[in-house]
């Protein structure tokens, strides 16, 4: 099980102190959080992509490239890379470059995003969202899988004898997850290509994500990539903890009540009852997270949102220390012990490169001697 954190990169006023962090402070905080993720033994750090205030992560690969130089072990990923408005050529180049810089510690989550105005900012029409997703991903796959690409589509200029550089590290493209909150077509694309499917699992009841993940698993098996329970699934989650449950509730309440997404809506008690959010003790965080496997089946990656809603960096780092000491070892042990032997581990570059090498060796012609 790969366990880590993801950020939506919001810049939000701290409702307790009234202080608004600067862009620079939030960017440096992201680096500090990623380093803490590695320090406590987590496996993944992922950042979102936004091109409007109040967010800072307009250039995820730049941020992740810097973090790669500050870390040695963790996988560096995105919470969303906008497949609809980014040029597939630039995605292919940027993430292959990040692969080389990080020594293969790179994958990405592709998604459509949730900000409609971003489409015209990049010369696209939001009504073409799904068609852009399909066409752009087909081109991205060709750019990574083929040395020379000749291609013509609807939404960008044709390519003739084009080679994307640098080439993927060891001939293995970065692993792709497809992220979706509500779009069945995205689950279909992930299943068709045998890619991973990442369910945000933050703001909706479990029944909503059970439908999307169930569809993805069914179609993954339909396309012949393996049994439904072998499909590669990632989940989000969200927590705030203190050693004493009531202390966590009291401390987090003003942040919850004023959060840009769910603030001034349902009560914190209702929201924690209806969604994956856990506010309480480390044991409560552990117990609720373990229920995800019961609802969604065996899965490979669990990421948590912990740095949003104006929470100060000091508090976020304390959350990670608590998680690393009281939750992570037991969570990893329990989830790994539940996973059947035929269900794969989370994807890594090393495993995928080894599988490719074995496949090439197996298909090589045998020459007789003598």
Residue ranges: model-predicted function:
Residues 3, 41, 49, 67, ...:
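Conserved, mostly hydrophobic/aromatic
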Residues 44-67, 82, 114, 201-204, ...:
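Glycine-rich, proline-tolerant flexible connector loops at the mouths of alpha/beta enzymes
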Residues 13-27, 81-89, 172-182, 274-282:
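Active-site mouth loops of central-metabolism enzymes
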Residues 1-77, 173, 343-345, 354-360, ...:
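N-terminal beta1-alpha1-beta2 module of alpha/beta enzyme domains
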Residues 1-21, 115-118, 157-172, 264-274, ...:
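N-terminal small/glycine-rich loop or linker at the start of catalytic domains
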Residues 3-7, 45-47, 76-78, 106-110, ...:
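Hydrophobic faces of well-ordered beta-strands that scaffold small-molecule active sites
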Residues 185-191, 209-217, 221-262:
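Aromatic-lined glycan-binding groove of carbohydrate-active enzymes
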